[in-house]
Swiss-Prot record:
Gene Ontology terms describing biological process: clathrin-dependent endocytosis of virus by host cell; fusion of virus membrane with host endosome membrane; fusion of virus membrane with host plasma membrane; viral budding from plasma membrane; virion attachment to host cell
Keywords: Clathrin- and caveolin-independent endocytosis of virus by host, Clathrin-mediated endocytosis of virus by host, Disulfide bond, Fusion of virus membrane with host endosomal membrane, Fusion of virus membrane with host membrane, Glycoprotein, Hemagglutinin, Host cell membrane, Host membrane, Host-virus interaction, Lipoprotein, Membrane, Palmitate, Signal, Transmembrane, Transmembrane helix, Viral attachment to host cell, Viral envelope protein, Viral penetration into host cytoplasm, Virion, Virus endocytosis by host, Virus entry into host cell
Feature type site, description Cleavage: R345, G346
Job of this protein: Binds to sialic acid-containing receptors on the cell surface, bringing about the attachment of the virus particle to the cell. This attachment induces virion internalization either through clathrin-dependent endocytosis or through clathrin- and caveolin-independent pathway. Plays a major role in the determination of host range restriction and virulence. Class I viral fusion protein. Responsible for penetration of the virus into the cell cytoplasm by mediating the fusion of the membrane of the endocytosed virus particle with the endosomal membrane.
Disulphide-bridged cysteine pairs: C30-C482, C68-C293, C80-C92, C113-C155, C297-C321, C489-C493
Record carries keyword Membrane: yes
Species this chain originates from: Influenza A virus (strain A/Memphis/2/1978 H3N2)
Topological category with respect to the lipid bilayer: Single-pass type I membrane protein
Protein name, per record: Hemagglutinin
Transmembrane segments: 531-551
Processing after translation: Palmitoylated.
Subunit structure: Homotrimer of disulfide-linked HA1-HA2.
Length: 566
């Protein structure tokens, strides 16, 4: 029985070797491109989902969880807000004259001095934050006739009653509080920021005890502006044992201008000025820890890499950051259209070209050749067309990043309740900008993906046409990305086709002769496969009949015994 099976196998192998297409006088050369078993889906202008061999994610969706201290100078506010550090709250004395690129305010920050409010809090905070320094210069104001350096038990500096270190609380001297009229010129060539305030006592008695007059007034003027504040006497909610308040105001004095302060009571006077600097410093609210690392882009969630053009970590950023978009993912095609290779190529192992499917396992190039000739089969990459495609795709990601990365920061906006309508408008504008950028990002990526796929398809077609021009009438286009070569073409011949040195004149006569001989006996392609399968089926049927007849004859002669058990 084993002998019969072995003979049958040998018969089929011989039969297969004699099939058309296995003639040693011809060869098959196929062109193809790289493919992978599982590609990546990307979006193009014409297709929402198209599979490519490789793609790069463009949206940064996670942070490091910490704020990197390099290359930006980070100042951790710890328990202090920027305004408390500016005013000189006793527990913020460590921030005097500090500098920063980014001031990080913590949610745990608190005030620990006299209760105050800042009518234009957001503007003052933004102004000081962008200046990037708390550098302070004392000036010799002349406050004749009043007592200086007032303090409060609500503002302890050590065991002693104290006050904001950058402000001077003035109150009556003996039983008088004269009208104060003090000037301070700006003879320097930079802007000066003066912080001052108005005290609002909780009762009329407190008002007269401190300032004699039943109603005070504070006027601060420059050549460009004037502010007059009338104190509002009356009780307020208790904070740190006090129901009185201080309102904080600020004035910028330009070079050559003069600061004029006029008051008959309730003045919280400046001790000097802050030097206003122009720069790109900023402030951010975050509870992320500050770590030793390097990152150009910072968000409240922590630092993020800026090697991608988009991010959806946070709208608030500082530094050179990817553009914020709503999408969680945007994939940029960095490979060609993926057509996974078919695992079965028929019973005789035929090869196929790029029109049918891609080729898996081409690790040394994107485009290449497969051949079948008298010496067997082989595969080689075409490095020139591969490099042409890669050169055009390389740098695509960098170009997208250059178009989208912000070289500035986006700070959070703060508004008082009075500015609610402005806040709503600002939110609408920001949301609209994000919607537009999200749409633009998706469109940009889709356009780039379309270009990449068209480009890689074009390189494949260029290689195919180049090969066709070399072979001319020596080969026939089989319609699947392959050529049937009508002359004997060994591996050296195949190599000359690949490297562009093939001389079709050398093989022209042989190819024409073989073409006419093969065409003379070759059936039309519409019937060839049917005849092949029918002849194979008949051969197998006859083989089975012969085998069955032999078994029956052997049983009759007693050479084979068959036992049937029930």
């Amino acid at each position: 029985m084993k002998t019969i099976i072995a003979l049958s196998y040998i018969f089929c192998q011989v039969f297969a070797q004699n099939l058309p297409g296995n003639d040693n006088s011809t060869a098959t050369l196929c062109l193809g491109h790289h493919a992978v078993p599982n590609g990546t889906l990307v979006k193009t202008i014409t297709n929402d989902q198209i599979e490519v061999t490789n793609a790069t994610e463009l949206v940064q969706s996670s942070s490091t969880g910490r704020i990197c201290d390099n290359p930006h100078r980070i100042l951790d506010g710890k328990n202090c807000t920027l305004i408390d550090a500016l005013l000189g709250d006793p527990h913020c004395d460590g921030f005097q004259n500090e500098k920063w690129d980014l001031f990080v305010e913590r949610s745990k920050a608190f005030s620990n001095c006299y209760p105050y409010d800042v009518p234009d809090y957001a503007s003052l905070r933004s102004l000081v934050a962008s200046s990037g320094t708390l550098e302070f210069f004392n000036e010799g104001f002349n406050w004749t006739g009043v007592t200086q350096n007032g303090g409060s038990y609500a503002c302890k500096r050590g065991p002693d009653n104290s006050f904001f270190s950058r402000l001077n609380w003035l109150y009556k001297s003996e039983s008088t509080y004269p009208v104060l009229n003090v000037t301070m010129p700006n003879n320097d060539n930079f802007d000066k920021l003066y912080i001052w305030g108005v005290h609002h006592p909780s009762t009329d008695k407190e008002q007269t005890n401190l300032y004699v007059q039943a109603s005070g007034r504070v006027t601060v003027s420059t050549k460009r502006s004037q502010q007059t504040i009338i104190p509002n006497v009356g009780p307020r909610p208790w904070v740190r044992g006090l129901s009185s308040r201080i309102s904080i105001y600020w004035t910028i004095v330009k070079p050559g201008d003069v600061l004029l302060i006029n008051s008959n009571g309730n003045l919280i006077a400046p001790r000097g000025y802050f030097k206003i600097r122009t720069g790109k410093s900023s402030i951010m609210r975050s509870d992320a820890p500050i770590g030793t690392c390097s990152s150009e882009c910072i968000t409240p969630n922590g630092s993020i890499p800026n090697d991608k053009p988009f991010q959806n970590v946070n709208k608030i950023t500082y530094g050179a950051c990817p553009k914020y978009v709503k999408q969680n993912t945007l994939k940029l095609a960095t490979g060609m259209r993926n057509v996974p290779e078919k695992q079965t190529r028929g019973i005789f192992g035929a090869i196929a070209g790029f029109i049918e499917n891609g080729w898996e396992g081409m690790i040394d190039g994107w485009y290449g050749f497969r051949h079948q000739n008298s010496e067997g089969t082989g595969q080689a990459a075409d490095l020139k067309s591969t490099q042409a495609a890669i050169d055009q795709i390389n740098g695509k990601l960098n170009r997208v990043i250059e178009k989208t990365n912000e070289k500035f920061h986006q700070i959070e906006k703060e508004f008082s309740e009075v500015e609610g309508r402005i806040q709503d408008l600002e939110k609408y504008v920001e949301d609209t900008k994000i919607d537009l950028w999200s749409y633009n990002a998706e469109l940009l990526v889709a356009l780039e993906n379309q270009h990449t796929i068209d480009l890689t398809d074009s390189e494949m077609n260029k290689l195919f046409e180049k090969t066709r021009r070399q072979l001319r009438e020596n080969a026939e286009d089989m319609g699947n990305g392959c050529f049937k070569i009508y002359h004997k073409c060994d591996n050296a011949c195949i190599g000359s086709i690949r490297n562009g040195t093939y001389d079709h004149d050398v093989y022209r006569d042989e190819a024409l002769n073989n073409r006419f001989q093969i065409k003379g006996v070759e059936l039309k392609s519409g019937y060839k496969d049917w005849i092949l399968w029918i002849s194979f089926a008949i051969s197998c049927f006859l083989l089975c009949v012969v085998l069955l007849g032999f078994i029956m004859w052997a049983c009759q002669k007693g050479n084979i015994r068959c036992n049937i058990c029930i």
